[in-house]
From Swiss-Prot:
It comes from Dictyostelium discoideum. Keywords: Cytoplasm, Gluconeogenesis, Glycolysis, Isomerase. Belongs to the GPI family. The gene is gpi. It comes from the Eukaryota. CDD domains: SIS_PGI_1 (cd05015), SIS_PGI_2 (cd05016). One of its GO terms (cellular component) is cytosol. GO terms for molecular function: carbohydrate derivative binding; glucose-6-phosphate isomerase activity; monosaccharide binding. One of its GO terms (biological process) is gluconeogenesis. Its main location: cytoplasm. InterPro entries: G6P_Isomerase, G6P_Isomerase_C, Phosphoglucose_isomerase_CS, SIS_dom_sf, SIS_PGI_1, SIS_PGI_2. The keyword Isomerase applies. This is Glucose-6-phosphate isomerase. HAMAP family: G6P_isomerase.
Length: 561
């Protein structure tokens, strides 16, 4: 593509030599923040979101060329196709309509196979509201007539990571005296055992989240949870009718497989539907978010949807040059494809967002970790980066050393809020002072003269200064984005998540890959199913490669079958 070639030429001639510190110290430095930041009033409820991307190795020509690349890649056309319900998930022949789940336009019409999906979406939301309000108010009782106090979401992948992250992020909007939320995802029995250890079965509600209701990890955990529950309420000493009634009051399903759901013992009316045009990693906006609604209340859940909807409208209707997801996506392409950066760090300076990096580790890597183009040909360029991160300031005392002085360039997103929900003393000011300082330090660095002056003031000898000098120099010129919310609320969280979702979409279109399938998760699952029967006897295994045979046989010879 000509636009890629133009960017490559720009990178070789100018881009790779851009020094941010010199740019800020130049005659144009005073306007660099203004030129390369966007303050967008997403909505009255969300408020302003500030994206400062001035601390990147870019100039105006860089951005102009990146916007040309976006247009040539048909980002706008593909964006419109997604919102209109066209089947852009070509390998599964599906629409991609997580945006429809949060569409707040009362007159919206979005069709899939000729049918408007909006009425179905709103019907499920109404059902979620009715159910969550009954449970939270105490109207819905457990089998002994006690009020539900704990909800356990059993799922994996998108059926787990989204609700886990959002309930943590919105913890300030919950009341643990009304409802506590727990999550089980890992097939390791320890996860379930430790979760239910201190729960009372009479006041616990289980949500089984599986679209097909056949996901091995989820159904195995659900069956074990059911066994624990039945044993706790009396086991075989309790009649079948009582057991059936108890299961009906303590288990609900998020699924499309009514036959398997009812076979499990869950009542049909306690099954919450979602659709095949909702990818797992985009499903927190659907019935998969039921645990969120139970934890913080349906009003806050709908505010969460509304915030995402307002970001959707920004993405859909804003010119590329002013479009936050587009700008972030293009910057990622710049580093991935021209600087050869293989990872990106997400660093929220907000403890409530502690699971945000893990959530988008799945969101980004499962979406864009592809090596085949939409036309079936192998890609010839780098695609999805490795996503990782931890909340500040914890990361500063763990891995920032590598970001500052390591050999790898790691673009970083710093996220913070102007206001804290917990303004204890000077805690928030100290937190934000670190937020500001880290991006400045990564950009500016510390040169030899500055280190020499610093050590001289400390009274060190010239010999000692010479010894320490190379160790204390910071090269700087490390790229960062700063994202500022006014306050972390259901609205602003929804907008923030949608911002990252659309950034991932933009990159997938530019790389010409399908961001909405995940065939990479299938092979391991298939092989695990064939291996499982081999673990149930004492026979030596020889049907695999020597390494796999050796591992299986070591396990079998050392375990008590």
């Amino acid at each position: 593509m000509e636009e890629f070639k133009n960017l490559k030429e720009h990178y070789e001639n100018i881009g790779k030599n851009i020094n941010m510190r010199k740019e800020f110290e130049s005659n144009y430095g005073a306007t660099r923040f203004k030129d390369f930041s966007k303050e967008v009033n997403i909505s009255k409820q969300v408020g302003t979101i500030l994206l400062d991307y001035s601390k990147n190795r870019i100039n105006k020509e860089t951005m102009d060329l990146l916007f040309e690349l976006a247009r040539a890649s048909k980002v706008e056309e593909m964006r419109n196709s997604m919102f209109q319900g066209e089947k852009i998930n070509i390998t599964e022949d599906r629409a991609v309509l997580h945006t429809a789940l949060r569409n707040r336009d009362p007159s919206a019409v979005i069709k899939v196979d000729g049918e408007n999906v909006i009425p179905s979406v709103r019907k499920v939301l109404d059902k979620m509201r009715s159910f969550s309000e009954r449970v939270r108010s105490g109207q819905w009782k457990g089998y002994t007539g006690k009020t539900i106090t704990d909800v356990v979401n059993i799922g994996i992948g998108g059926s787990d990571l989204g609700p886990v992250m959002v309930t943590q992020a919105l913890k300030n909007y919950a009341n643990d005296k009304v409802m506590r939320a727990h999550f089980v995802s890992n097939i390791d029995g320890t996860h379930l055992a430790e979760t239910v250890k201190h729960l009372c079965p009479e006041t616990t509600l289980f949500i089984v989240a599986s679209k097909t209701f056949t996901t091995q990890e989820t159904i195995t955990n659900a069956q074990s949870a059911r066994s624990w529950f039945l044993e706790k309420i009396g086991g075989s000493s309790v009649s079948a009718d009582v057991q059936k009634h108890a299961i009906g009051q303590h288990f609900v399903a998020l699924s499309t497989n009514e036959q398997e759901v009812t076979k499990f013992g869950i009542l049909k009316e306690n099954m919450f539907e979602f659709w095949d045009w909702v990818g797992g990693r985009y499903s927190v906006w659907s019935a998969i978010g039921l645990s969120v609604a139970l934890y913080v209340g349906m009003d806050h859940f709908e505010s969460f949807l509304e915030g995402a909807y307002h970001m959707d409208q920004h993405f859909l209707n804003t010119p590329l040059e002013l479009n936050l997801p587009v700008i972030m996506g293009l910057l990622g392409v710049w580093y991935n494809n021209f600087f050869g950066c293989q990872t990106q760090a997400i660093l929220p300076y907000d403890q409530y967002l502690s699971r945000f990096p893990a959530y988008f580790q799945q969101g980004d890597m499962e979406s864009n970790g592809k090596s085949v183009q939409r036309n079936g040909e192998r890609v010839t360029h780098s695609t999805g980066p490795i996503i990782w991160g931890e909340p500040g300031t914890n990361g500063q005392h763990a891995f920032y050393q590598l970001i500052h002085q390591g050999q790898k360039i790691i673009p970083c997103d710093f996220i913070a809020s102007v206001e804290s929900h917990n303004p204890l003393g000077k805690h928030h000011q100290i937190l934000l002072s670190n937020f500001f300082a880290q991006t400045e330090a990564l950009m500016k660095g510390k040169n030899e003269q500055e280190v020499t002056n610093e050590l001289t003031k400390e009274g060190l000898s010239q010999e000692k200064i010479k010894q320490l000098l190379p160790h204390k120099v910071f090269e700087g010129n490390r790229p960062t984005n700063s994202i500022f919310l006014h306050k972390l609320t259901p609205h602003s969280l929804g907008a923030l998540i949608a911002l990252y979702e659309h950034k991932i979409f933009v990159q997938g279109i530019i790389w010409n890959i399908n961001s909405f399938d995940q065939w990479g998760v299938e092979l391991g699952k298939q092989l695990a199913k064939s291996i499982l029967p081999e673990l149930s006897d004492n026979n030596e295994v020889s049907t695999h490669d020597s390494s796999t045979n050796g591992l299986i046989n070591f396990y079998k010879s050392n375990s008590k079958l």
